[in-house]
């Protein structure tokens, strides 16, 4: 009986240690992803100065929120006077729910890897200098509610993959250089037209069966 109890205690201790190691590995991976973002940014106001890669747990860093399992769920860097570009490593933050990087001077493209953020609820990248196309991979974000990409320099069509996100309530892509037609399917049926304004080559709303969505879009 004593030996049996000892084996149970050893098994329980082993399980606890395994879970702790898994969480430590996750924290390291998320910390590496955030540090990659820090390296890509110019930060004159030292907003991300606390993002020290020698600290194992990124939950101690300013502007980073974690859940009870020490997994990164929110990144708040809106209106922080940041410039630079986004990095594909952000796609490793699989528990992230809110990515807030609005009102900065961030340039370059939106990484397609953001489509891996399966828990994402809000993607706020408005008022930056982002270029390139809206990644079709964002259509994989099945929990997304808010998508605000307005006031950038994005080009190309609005990806039709976004029309299958049933949770999507707010889409704003105004003030870009998008082309093609405005979708009317799925959640886009209820998006106000002003959220598509100031895209000189964007036409719509789309006439289903009559107009190609990439009309006038090269």
Swiss-Prot record:
The keyword Repeat applies. SUPFAM superfamilies: L domain-like (SSF52058). The lineage of its organism: Eukaryota, Viridiplantae, Streptophyta, Embryophyta, Tracheophyta. Pfam families: LRR_14, LRRNT_2. LRR repeats lie at residues 69-93, 94-117, 119-141, 142-165, 167-190. Keywords: Leucine-rich repeat, Plant defense, Repeat, Signal. This is Leucine-rich repeat protein 2. Disulfide bonds: none annotated. It comes from the Eukaryota. One of its GO terms (biological process) is defense response. The gene is LRR2. Transmembrane segments: none annotated. Residues 1-27 form the signal peptide. PANTHER family: SOMATIC EMBRYOGENESIS RECEPTOR KINASE 1. Probably involved in plant defense response.
